[in-house]
């Protein structure tokens, strides 16, 4: 069966026909990414960002192929780049919403950071996903599985969130590095190496080394150094 959204399965005490309708609804949501809430907040993607979306699609599809899964392309329309002043989450820089079938990303200052963040969110997008009709009297349609994350059947608890994030980030670090040889990132990689060499003794506020072998991007900003 052709994959029409990230949702692979519907769990719950409803008929098969109702489950099929939910899957179709998610497919329609995947195809329709017009959200009123994003009006005036989402900006147009740059040519470089569109090319990076294509590169990350190819790379994450190769990951799916390792596990015997078919390709699943995420169109640029499902990636929403939100302007800095409109971004609602102070700590987070991106998130995937399986119910809305889209990724929201705070606009990035570099191609390398955009690529790494998108790679992480696309792994979430392309991981196993299931939704459920909860077991409560006032049942509702919510997530059941996204990757390793599991919601209880009553919808009140979520397990393995930190594990899912850790595994996703480890896969991102390991496989996104394969894209760094692309010309889109060459200038930034050279800059990062220069900054790391210049500030090789730099530490964080908690006295840990600022840079390590997994540093993707670094930029000197006046008296501060920014890294990802």
Describe the function of each predicted region:
Residues 1-7, 168:
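Non-Sec secretion/translocation targeting segments of pathogen effectors
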Residues 8-11, 15, 19-27, 39, ...:
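Residue-level detector of alpha-helical secondary structure
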């Amino acid at each position: 069966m052709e994959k029409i959204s990230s949702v692979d399965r519907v769990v719950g005490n409803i008929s098969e026909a109702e489950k099929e309708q939910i899957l179709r609804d998610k497919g329609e949501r995947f195809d329709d990414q017009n959200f009123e809430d994003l009006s005036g907040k989402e900006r147009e993607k740059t040519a470089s960002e569109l090319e990076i979306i294509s590169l990350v699609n190819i790379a994450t599809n190769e990951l799916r192929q390792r596990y015997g899964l078919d390709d699943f392309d995420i169109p640029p329309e499902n990636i929403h780049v939100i302007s800095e002043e409109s971004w609602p989450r102070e700590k987070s820089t991106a998130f995937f919403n399986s119910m809305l079938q889209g990724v929201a990303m705070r606009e990035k200052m570099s191609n390398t950071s955009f690529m790494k963040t998108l790679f992480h969110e696309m792994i979430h997008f392309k991981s196993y996903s299931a939704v459920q009709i909860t077991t409560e009297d006032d049942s509702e349609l919510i997530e059941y599985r996204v990757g390793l994350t599991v919601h209880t059947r009553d919808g009140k608890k979520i397990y393995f969130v930190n594990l899912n994030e850790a595994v996703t980030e480890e896969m991102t670090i390991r496989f996104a590095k394969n894209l760094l040889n692309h010309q889109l990132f060459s200038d930034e990689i050279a800059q990062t190496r220069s900054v790391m060499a210049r500030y090789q003794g730099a530490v964080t506020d908690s006295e840990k080394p600022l840079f390590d072998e997994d540093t993707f991007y670094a930029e000197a900003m006046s008296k501060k150094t920014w890294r990802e």
